[in-house]
Amino acid sequence: MAVVAVFPALARMLAVSRRRLVSPSLSMTSCRRCYRGDSPTDSQKDMIEIPLPPWQERTDESIETKRARLLYESRKRGMLENCILLSLFAKEHLQHMTEKQLNLYDRLINEPSNDWDIYYWATEAKPAPEIFENEVMTLLRDFAKNKNKEQRLRAPDLEYLFEKPH
């Protein structure tokens, strides 16, 4: 009773919440969410497409600089799924890749404008465009299958970069 006197707005809000619990028809109409693209008549004319500069192979880069850049770019993707997948893939494969494979990997992770595309191609949820169907994509898909059932919850620590080769 004292709450009603001190906080009348809170009391009204709680009363409405109780009515929603009692009356399903009220809660259905007031809780419906609409997301962009739900409407079949949405023309998406209000969408702004920002053109990205086309990917260009860096021919003036040493192979060690390229490896370091690709390691960084594999770790800093902007979406956690690809950060984990690509950073672990880079840890396992980057040091053993030929220059040709490094160029293919560079193109794969830097040419597509949407990181989800890379993730869907690697997990085989969607087919990759012909230009990306190559030996590096095969390696990435095989890695994404996680045949050894490793626990992959985060990007690897960087200590492995400073370990002495065995």
From Swiss-Prot:
It is found in: Mitochondrion matrix. Interacts with SDHA within the SDH catalytic dimer. This is Succinate dehydrogenase assembly factor 2, mitochondrial. Keywords: Chaperone, Mitochondrion, Transit peptide. Gene3D superfamilies: Flavinator of succinate dehydrogenase (1.10.150.250). Its main location: mitochondrion. InterPro entries: SDH, SDH_sf, SDHAF2. Residues 1-29 form a transit peptide. Belongs to the SDHAF2 family. Plays an essential role in the assembly of succinate dehydrogenase (SDH), an enzyme complex (also referred to as respiratory complex II) that is a component of both the tricarboxylic acid (TCA) cycle and the mitochondrial electron transport chain, and which couples the oxidation of succinate to fumarate with the reduction of ubiquinone (coenzyme Q) to ubiquinol. Required for flavinylation (covalent attachment of FAD) of the flavoprotein subunit SDHA of the SDH catalytic dimer. GO terms for biological process: mitochondrial electron transport, succinate to ubiquinone; mitochondrial respiratory chain complex II assembly; protein-FAD linkage; tricarboxylic acid cycle. Coiled coil: none annotated. GO terms for cellular component: mitochondrial matrix; mitochondrion. The gene is SDHAF2.
